Amino acid sequence: MSNDGVNAGRRRFLVAATSVVGAAGAVGAAVPFVGSWFPSAKAKAAGAPVKVNVSKIEPGQQMVAEWRGQPVFIVRRTEEILGNLKKIEGQLSDPTSKNSVQPTYVDPQVRSIKPEILLLIGICTHLGCSPTFRPEVAPADLGKDWVGGYFCPCHGSHYDLAGRVYKSQPAPLNLPVPPHSYESDEIIVVGVDTEKA
């Protein structure tokens, strides 16, 4: 039996079939790859704005919410706390918040829209630890000049109750203020700018 002749029809069929299978494989591999470029539902939810009811926060107390996987400290400040903020400005590294991360619509001295409600991202600007809320005045471990604020237990940075860092601390900047807006007197939306709300 002689095999001299090439079956052109069979060759075309094999080339076409191989091309179709190869193209299907390439599309099958590309679909999950392209899909990985887009955020998952979980990632979208993590970056979504968060509504927080602040009506139950007692004066001088703090609550913690979560936004984008970060703690958000929310403090209801008293007149005494607000008065103490002015007394310690000379001890602060950036008292007018010129170098700080905060929306333009917050008052740079009290670092909030409404003086009595403070929102801060609760991550130290030094190495990312979470500062502890220390509202008491002149505790033994923080000294007689302490008027309340935040203490970072990792490396000892001190912040006042506006999130402003004291001079000569490891932390280089004030605690960040997240974008936020008021839906009502009791509901704050963290993650939505007042200017865009």
What are these regions (language model features)?
Residues 2-21:
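N-terminal secretory signal peptides and thylakoid transit peptides that target proteins
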Residues 16, 26-70:
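C-terminal segment of N-terminal export signals and the immediately downstream linker at the start
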Residues 41, 54-61, 71, 96, ...:
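Solvent-exposed, flexible loop/coil residues
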Residues 54, 67, 75-76, 121, ...:
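Pocket-edge structural micro-motifs
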Residues 61-108:
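Extracytoplasmic/periplasmic/luminal assembly and interaction segments
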Residues 90-197:
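Rieske [2Fe-2S] iron-sulfur-binding domain
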